[in-house]
A protein has these predicted regions:
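Generic structural signal for well-ordered alpha-helices
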Residues: 64-71, 100-105, 130-134, 170-173, ...
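Auxiliary Fe-S-binding modules of radical SAM enzymes
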Residues: 2-12, 18-23, 213, 221-296
Length: 296
């Protein structure tokens, strides 16, 4: 199975650009989010238990120590010698600019770290942060700003307690473009109340804004979340694998050649997962996506 026959994958992009495989190393810098700390709300997104989707990152130790530990784990199973530091947990631009710079500088100080991937919310990227990231990019580092949108529908964003709007996302994208930053947008399929058509609409709206890359995830119902409580009450229908695969295939078929796919699914930590069970089987999902592309 060679998905790169049909999909412009981020991994292949990095391999072609740098002449070798580049791997991401997750970092937890102990950030929070404005919809968790009371600024915009409490409790966070209704689907979010951060341990479930960034289990490899921990709060133990400095950025340097975390990167060293992650690199040691990766080098046991991968051939990668150079890496991108992935600030993944919560909103990694939500803080004082001095603290952000110190953390990012610490990550980039390691010779094997070629760049940063910064996961955050569209309402947490003021211009000084964008300027800082643009400065790193101009120095030759591989910089990616990953904006968690999840849906372009404000009713859905409210439903999952995101605490921001699609207009916030549009504003963030336009300002990031002004600074020349590489943008990746996260989308979730299976949000309660949404259909496959809604996911395709969100995808098209992201494309229309000139974003360079996307990540697509099926909705995970994980322990310790508001969504889990609703699911147990029968209020959240399970997303089927067929619906997910068919929608992803449709997205890939209609994608511009230059659009990068950073991820086509997400598996998370199995010990937290309640539903749907099929998301545990990453390679089955990717195989079904590949088969759908071949048969098309």
């Amino acid at each position: 199975m060679d998905l790169t026959r049909y999909v412009n994958t981020f991994g292949n992009y990095l391999r072609q650009k740098y002449g070798e495989p580049i791997h991401k190393l997750s970092v937890n810098a102990d950030f929070t989010c404005p919809n968790r700390d009371g600024t915009k709300g409490i409790g966070g997104c209704s689907f979010c238990n951060n341990n479930s989707f960034s289990p490899a990152s921990t709060k133990a130790g400095s950025v340097t120590a975390q990167l060293h530990a992650a690199r040691t784990r990766v080098e046991q199973v991968r051939k990668a010698r150079r890496f991108i530091a992935y600030f993944q947990s919560y909103s990694n631009t939500y803080g004082e600019i001095e603290r952000l710079k110190a953390l990012y500088d610490e990550a980039l100080a390691a010779d094997e770290i070629i760049g940063l991937a910064i996961g955050t919310r569209p309402d947490c990227v003021p211009d000084p942060v964008l300027a800082l990231l643009a400065d790193y990019q101009q120095q030759g580092h591989e910089i990616w700003l990953e904006l968690g949108l999840q849906s372009s529908f404000d009713t859905s964003l409210e439903r999952i307690n995101r605490g921001h709007t699609f207009a916030d996302y549009e504003d963030a994208v336009q300002r990031a473009h002004h600074f020349g930053l590489n943008l990746c947008t996260h989308l979730i399929m299976g949000i309660p109340g949404e259909t496959a058509k809604d996911t395709l609409t969100s995808y098209q709206r992201v494309l229309d804004l000139g974003v360079k890359a996307i990540k697509i995830h099926p909705l995970h119902i994980v322990k310790g979340t508001q969504l889990a409580r609703e699911w147990k009450q029968g209020l959240v229908p399970d997303l089927t694998m067929d619906d997910y695969v068919n929608t992803v295939v449709e997205i890939i078929k209609t994608a511009p050649k230059e659009l990068l796919f950073h991820r086509l699914t997400g598996s998370g930590a199995h010990q937290y997962l309640l539903a749907p069970d099929w998301v545990k089987h990453k390679w089955d999902i990717l195989g079904a996506i590949y088969a759908g592309l071949v048969n098309h």
